[in-house]
Amino acid sequence: MPLAQIPAAAYGPGPRSPRPDPSCRRQGERHFDVIVYGDEPAGVMTALELSRQLPRLAGLPRPRIALLTPSDLRAGLGGTIARSGLAYLDRNQVPRDMWAVLPPFAPSSDLYRRFLRLTGVQQIAVDPRQASRAFRRALARARITLLAGVEPTGTELERAAAADGGTLQGEGSDRLCVIETAGHGRLGADLFIDASLGADLAHRASVPFLRGLGPRGLSRESISLGWIFEVEGLSITQLRNLEEQLTRRLLDRRDREAQHWLVGWPAYRNNRQRLLADLVDQRGNPLLLYSATSDSADQQSPALSIAVHGEQGLAPGLRRAPARMDAANVAILPDRLSFNALLFRNSAAQNREVIARHGRPLGWMVPAAADVESFFLRHGARRVHWMPELYIRSADQIAHPRMALSAGLMARGGVPRPEALGTFSYHLDFRGGISAYVPPAKPTFNFGYRHTLPREVSNLAVLGPASGFGGLGQGAGRIIELNISVGQGLAIASALALARRLPLAAVDPREVARLMPAGFAPYGRPSGSTAFSLFLGRLLYQLESWFPRWPWEPGWHSPLAS
């Protein structure tokens, strides 16, 4: 039978490796097989996947897994979704030429598919409250230890020298043994996954980082911060009616108040044709909220933004003002609308400050939020609720990953196919940051997990925006779906590493890729692929269901001979 169909038990721990045991001498006051630090959605889902993979692949019937977070979980479990309120999910955007074999939002992994089902997502919108409750129940069912309010005060590392004086294959010079905490004592593990937004654990383990969005001039740059808010008492229909009213006012030269709003928008004030092009369609009808799905809507027109800034006399654009009401992504929740729209100017230094504050808004941001709230209350909203944490889109990235998943690699189609966990397609989105200077790109790329492995610490992975994206790769690397899907492969690699007493980097990524669930074959391609190469890629994707591995790949076994 094909290797992909061999029972998972066949991959079990097997005989003890002749290699020296890489586990630490210092075990801590409480010891776990794996500690996941950070309750971001990718961290939660990876912990759940570890609870499935460690019994199957590592021979641990009752694995000891802990999920640690420095946050106060009374505000919700699930980081960017639960406390930052990100209800409008950025989904994998399957290229149109693949729609004959995949739906437009096909999940990029089985783990992300299970995330959608767990949190009750129909298409785009996830309810932060419902997701938080679902995460809690799932962790309890999996018997994963959940510790909140864990503030690391230090780490304990050991040199990773083998007994014979050499070093283990693929291993860095150190291994992380213990997290020192205030209130929870010394917590040890064989493996650590840092899934926090800013990779605080990796920083404390002395892993070097690439600052900002890359070397040289980009080291001070960051993607804009967002403050998501929820509006009660307004329906999508009422919001469209408001957009239409504002559009007609902006186009009415006799409406002096609306014309005054345009003072801060010289590109519109001095160019009537451009204003028309952005406010109305070819038939002269106002461009209103567009719903591609039943649970979401996207603003096509700047009318609402012009009115919000104009009523308050605020300059638009993050180069002239510290805040901007951007075109909104609206998630339609059962009793409210969630707006991802308010952006704040950001820098790498400020981004680090906000991460250190666990995402709490800075004082200077409050007046802009108050102006937005006042606007919606004046136009029919019953209540505006601000999320307790900012939406943080970026972080400093590990400087020396085993394989950087950079923007350049994404443009070339991603990691080699035999090592690919799956494929992801999305715009490199630097919303409100350096987007004016970066040409638009939407790569369709294969992803692996080795960009999460810093070379300096052999038993640590960094999962999330702080992974090794080589700078601008973070434009896609910040997306929740991609990081959850990477987490599935990382969980498999972790199980194999524990079973064989290997450092994470010594696990063969091709074996990890073969153990990924069927139905998510990679189809990455270089940007600008020809029509013929796209056709060939689609054909190979369809053949994958019959031949899970190819004759030229090591270990291939024909299903005809089964």
What name fits each language-model region?
Residues 42-43, 131-135, 197, 201, ...:
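Stable alpha-helical elements in mature extracytoplasmic
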Residues 156-186:
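Conserved beta-strand-loop-beta-strand element in the redox core of flavoprotein oxidoreductases
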Residues 12-18, 80, 185-191, 196-519, ...:
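Flavin (FAD/FMN)-binding glycine-rich loop and adjacent Rossmann-like elements that form
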Residues 34-63:
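N-terminal Rossmann-like FAD-binding beta1-loop-alpha1 element of flavoenzymes
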Residues 41, 45, 151-153, 191, ...:
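Mobile, glycine-rich extracellular loop/lid and propeptide segments
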Residues 40-41, 125-130, 477, 481, ...:
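Soluble non-cytosolic domains of exported or imported proteins
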Residues 31-36, 99, 118-126, 188, ...:
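Second-shell loop/turn segments in exported
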Residues 2-15, 21-23, 29-31, 55-154, ...:
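Conserved N-terminal/central alpha/beta ligand/cofactor-binding core
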